[in-house]
Amino acid sequence: MKTKILKEKQEVINKLQVGDVHDYPLNKWFPKNSWSTERKIKFTLKKIEKYYDAELAEADAIENAEEVREFAISVEWANSRMWGANPNATIRVGYDEFISGSISGSGYDKESTAIAGAFNQSEKLRGILYKNRGKIADKYGWYDCDCSLSGGVGSECFWRIFESCGYEVKHVASGKTYDAWIVSKK
């Protein structure tokens, strides 16, 4: 994961050192015609360093995350006049709580989007995917792992991924406006 980030960082820096600052996304922050190309490059290099340092710190936290024995997922549904039922997922890992916020719209699986949104906030949980990336890749073709879940694919897909990582998923409660699962190490 770190090597991929470092490689991407080096590619961006190499492109920038050639003097190609006009296609760089940060060029919208440059004052019009008042900065020299050297100053633009220096400014952009600082921004690149800051961005990739944060990416590397996150990757390091994911790689060194402690093992999660159990976590709870709950999804509450709220009615919306425009979008029908909107889910809001909460994942609890020990004393930590991660909340997705309300997911609206139509044409995709909102429940899995809410669960993925809450899951991806935790380095501990993303560490599960990182440490078991070989098992996941063999089963689901997930070779270039960014160690996060994608929403809109159906929550059943997540349960199968967790099971392939050595976890057991139990649906412990459901009702008209809520669902709850416990995911624990086998």
Regions of interest found by a model, annotated:
Residues M1-I13:
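Short, charge/polar-rich alpha-helical segments
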Residues F71-V75:
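A short beta-strand micro-motif
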